[in-house]
Amino acid sequence: MKNPFFKPNKSELIFDGDYNPKGLALNLNYGDIFSNIGYIKFDENPFKTIDISSLQLGLNKNINEQTKAKISFAIYDFEKVKEFSPNQITWNGKNFGNSIDDNGNYLYDFSLMNLSLEIKTKMMSLPTTFFLDIVNNSDADENDRGFQSGLSLKINEKWKFTYLFKDIESDSTFGALTHSDFGGGGTGHKGHQFNLSYPVTERFSVDVVWFDNKKKMITDYNKILVDFKYKL
């Protein structure tokens, strides 16, 4: 199914954009208030399926004629990750930046608290989106925080430009699920990301993405990616 949770400007801080979870989800709305409840699964490896219990509460509010804001708080609780090794959980046996203990198992579990904010308005008559996404893993003793913030500008009817800065510490979120291209994928990276998007047709679009990152917080990582997207 499509990811049911609100992610500001399609943030990939916790979930990669290509992740389509399996499981159950319930969406509830009452006036400006919305909520998303989910029981989803991460099952890349046949040896072990990780269950994720989740709850998101939020507010979607029109500030004035041209500005609206959306804010939410979410909890994502991963079931007993630290009892297992990446070989039992991820598709290729890699830990994707998360800390490992002396036995080769995950050092921490993942109980994530997530604060998200998106403001849509106009800046110099251009449709503009400001966004902020913050995550904290309460089960980790250190390197437990991550965030990304930035803006998106619709330059004209076709072109859209997006800039963001991200700092995602090694145990702030589950590395196998976060953005698979930023810093080479996984956690423990920080830096800049620039996107230029062009819709060729209503269903087909092309994105050019430049990553200017610090891989593992110290090593330069620069990559240009051309992403072709087609909506079914």
What are these regions (language model features)?
Residues G31, E65-T67, S85-L232:
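Outer-membrane beta-barrel pore domains
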Residues V81:
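Active-site-proximal acidic segments at structured loop/helix or strand boundaries
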